[in-house]
Design a protein with these regions (language model features):
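Structural signature of Gram-negative outer-membrane beta-barrels, strongest in the C-terminal barrel
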Residues: 1-61, 66-67, 91-107, 111-117, ...
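Residues on the lipid-exposed face of transmembrane beta-strands in outer-membrane beta-barrel proteins
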Residues: 8-12, 22, 108-112, 198-202, ...
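Repeated loop/turn-to-beta-strand initiation elements of outer-membrane beta-barrel proteins
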Residues: 16-20, 117-122, 208-211, 266-270, ...
Length: 365
């Protein structure tokens, strides 16, 4: 098919030190080869809830019918269990019927370079991004909600697409016979985010050394994902400041990186400060977890680097990463997706290695 994209933007400088800028874009992205043709694979992901587990289906005829429609044998009703490891089978894979995803984005911001402060420059930009027909997989929570919430029915495709172990009725077991939850890619997703980026840089000569200060910060106002954009009942899930199996990587409300560098004749000393705002477990699922697992406090990391310019063509760099040996907060193994919460500590966001050292050499010819 044919897709059209376009972009419009402009800038205005009311005074020499200030530039105001803005832009609007209509963009598209076609699915890649993997998204189209990846072979379906059944594996494991974290989740420790199953509406069909326990005695509930024995007293609820509709729930019993749903469990049976998902492939549970009649003899398993009342004895279905949740995996003791807190995991379920999930089937992921490509989709040859995927179409292009489409986004409308707009930004407005300013560039400030004051004549009264040589060496100082600042930019601030508000961004607003809405992605429709997003190439995404539903979250595990969304798959369960589509079936078991809002007048569930044993004939609802959202229910029958969940496939249980044909011997036990569980959602875990042999991957050859238990596809579990369908997480294949579709164009049903909708993603929205907005926030502010702030960048500031300052350079000056202190006499005994050169000083460079750099700052990059982000404030995220909203980061929402809707698994089915065409279903008014589909949850428009907010993930800013939250973590759970239903949110991807942790998105703090505020984060920044600040670097201070002192440059001497042949040595550069640099201290980098990384800040990650505090986050908490998604309110919709908070009660399922221990109190101590429901929050991760704000984190400050410091990295120290020294560059020795031995000659014009040879330099040595020594670094200490995570200078104060900060340890990540342990939050349990099943509170987030295995893609991001491997090892109970969200190593995709937080430093799980502790203080470490490196020495590198660079030679130019």
């Amino acid at each position: 098919g044919t897709e059209y994209t376009w972009k419009a933007g402009g800038s205005w400088s009311p005074v020499p030190s200030l530039q105001i800028r803005g832009g609007y874009q209509r963009v598209t992205r076609a699915p890649n080869i993997s998204e189209l043709f990846a072979v379906p694979v059944t594996g494991l992901d974290n989740f420790d809830t199953d509406p069909c587990a326990g005695a509930a289906p024995t007293t609820d005829a509709n729930l019993r019918a749903i469990c049976l429609a998902q492939g549970a044998p009649a003899t398993s009703i009342g004895s279905i269990i949740v995996d003791p490891a807190g995991q379920v089978n999930v089937t992921t894979g490509g989709n040859p019927n995927l179409a292009a995803e489409k986004a409308n984005t707009w930004t407005i911001g300013a560039v400030f370079q004051p004549v009264f402060a040589p060496g100082l420059s600042m930019t601030i930009d508000y961004y607003n991004i809405k992605l429709n027909d997003a190439i995404t997989s539903p979250t595990i929570g969304d798959v369960f909600s589509a079936c078991f919430d809002n007048n569930p029915s044993p004939t609802n495709p959202a229910c029958t697409s969940i496939r249980r172990n044909p011997a036990t009725g569980n959602l875990f077991g042999n991957v050859g016979t238990t596809p579990g939850l369908p997480l294949v890619l579709t164009n049903q997703g909708q993603i929205f985010t907005d926030g502010i980026d702030l960048v500031a840089n300052y350079s000056t000569d202190l006499g005994f050394a050169g000083l460079d200060l750099g700052f990059f910060g982000n404030w995220t106002n909203r980061s929402r994902f809707k698994a089915n954009q065409d279903d008014p009942a589909s949850l428009n899930r907010e993930c800013v400041g939250y973590y759970s199996i239903n949110c991807a990587s942790i998105q703090p409300e505020f984060s920044f990186t600040q670097r201070t560098t002192l440059s001497f004749d042949q040595v550069d000393l640099s201290l980098r400060w990384r800040f990650i705002d505090a986050v908490e477990v998604e309110p919709l699922v908070a009660d399922a977890f221990l109190e101590d697992f429901r929050t991760i406090p704000s984190e400050h990391y410091f990295d120290l680097t020294a560059v020795f310019n031995v000659t014009d063509s040879f330099a040595l760099t020594a670094a200490v990463i995570n200078l104060f040996d900060n340890e990540p907060k342990v939050v349990g193994s099943n509170i987030g997706s295995t893609s991001y919460n491997s090892g109970n500590v969200f190593p995709s966001t937080y430093d799980a290695l502790g203080r470490r050292y490196s020495v590198t050499a660079r030679m130019t010819f």
